[in-house]
Amino acid sequence: MNTEAAGRRVHVIQGEFKVVNDPDIVLSTILGSCVAACMRDPAAGVGGMNHFLLPGSATSPSSGADATRYGVHLMELLINGLLKQGARRDRLEAKIFGGARTIARFSNVGEQNAAFARQFLMDEGIRIVGESTGGDHGRKLEYWPSSGRARQYALTGVEAQRALQMDQRPAVPKPAESPIEFF
């Protein structure tokens, strides 16, 4: 039996990243104008995915819920998460997905997201081994970090509307830090 087909699914939502070293895990997400970067170190057997809404911030938030929307923050978190799990920066390889223009009358944030991801990876010296960005439809993405295999499905109709709604929904806010400790 193909272990990739039977893998345990872990969904990555907007504003999140996941790093795994379990060969039975399949990371999945649904993308409209958002972009997901999938990275791995094939020698270390570790990989992960992020899912960001916007490329970067002029104010570069360092903490709080706002930071999780931005690619600049989530790309750093993903890379650092991989390094903490034994990956080496010089062996990292990446695939990028998403960046669709889901509504013609809106600015093309999807194209900006994809361009940001490409430039960020190039600046960091991380090889891009695959890319599927742009277009007019959202995507459902599955990524097997252990092998680097990725599979996507074009979303149409109801699925596309759901992806669009997810892209327009704000990222889940993180709880505010407080000096109060509860027991």
From Swiss-Prot:
Domain of life: Bacteria
Biological-process GO terms, alphabetical: chemotaxis
EC number of the protein: 3.5.1.44
CDD domains: CheD
Enzyme class at the top of the EC tree: hydrolase
InterPro entries (alphabetical): CheD-like_sf (IPR038592), Chemorcpt_Glu_NH3ase_CheD (IPR005659), Cytotoxic_necrot_fac-like_cat (IPR011324)
Reactions that this protein is recorded to catalyse: L-glutaminyl-[protein] + H2O = L-glutamyl-[protein] + NH4(+)
Keywords: Chemotaxis, Hydrolase
HAMAP family, alphabetized: CheD
Family: Belongs to the CheD family.
Role description: Probably deamidates glutamine residues to glutamate on methyl-accepting chemotaxis receptors (MCPs), playing an important role in chemotaxis.
Protein name per its UniProtKB record: Probable chemoreceptor glutamine deamidase CheD
Species in which this protein is naturally found: Rhizobium meliloti (strain 1021) (Ensifer meliloti)
Gene field: cheD
